[in-house]
């Protein structure tokens, strides 16, 4: 029921976007270029065909770019594909399908868990025999297809750790992954999407260019935002569900998440411990409608 309700609300916001966008053009509000970032976890062999079907639909309806895309001469929908946790199933089942279609992706690696089953609570149902890719597999990934990003060392809730421990998770995961692969790792995703303002500041100091949460906020790549939101996707999503997600129809959930946190834990919200990315100030009308434009 909860899933169906999300689909219904997303349909409403997606349809509302048409007249709002038209009205914005009439009154002279510039339509900003948007990026929708999808994120997956594991891709078991049993659902590989469904993942491939989603990639076909994505190619038909959007231009696929890297998760670090800063904007450019692209018309229509723009999407990026990311994977958290660097599971072997992603390398075995997702990457061959992406390679066939020449679709780039970003994989976020928990460097302290290489070659082992996940020792953390999973956000989605995953194949029980899946493990994190080992060092040799990570090093073998083609840089023309895969951009690597850090996902800390041990996949903790960063905002709950002592500050120095959190700093070590952030800094060491970047330096170790860079040394292992020979790449200058500049991207990181937060485990569980958990961060606060201090954690975000640590990431900047550690040398990351962009970091990623799990709230489906609208990403405006030309605005120079440091924290980018993403929308969770599964090969089990229905065609309508996947279309709405890749089209940015789930952006309203960032508002719902912010309101829920403010109501349930006002002190935590005011202290800045939240998943929703912080953006530069905007006018009230523009802020409310920005996800529709």
Q: Model-found features: residue ranges?
A:
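C-terminal active-site subregion of NodB/CE4 polysaccharide deacetylases
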Residues: 2-82, 88-89, 93, 160-293
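Histidine-centered catalytic micro-motifs
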Residues: 38, 43, 147-156
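Acidic (Asp/Glu)-rich catalytic clusters
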Residues: 54-63, 96-103, 130-150
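Generic enzyme active-site microenvironment
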Residues: 82-83, 149
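Acidic/aromatic-lined carbohydrate-recognition and catalytic surfaces
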Residues: 83-88, 94-97, 101, 110, ...
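A short, conserved beta-to-alpha structural element at the edge of catalytic cores
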Residues: 102-124
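A short acidic, helix-capping loop that chelates divalent metal ions and anchors anionic groups
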Residues: 116-119, 156-161
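Alpha-helix N-cap and loop-to-helix initiation/capping positions
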Residues: 125-129, 133, 161-168
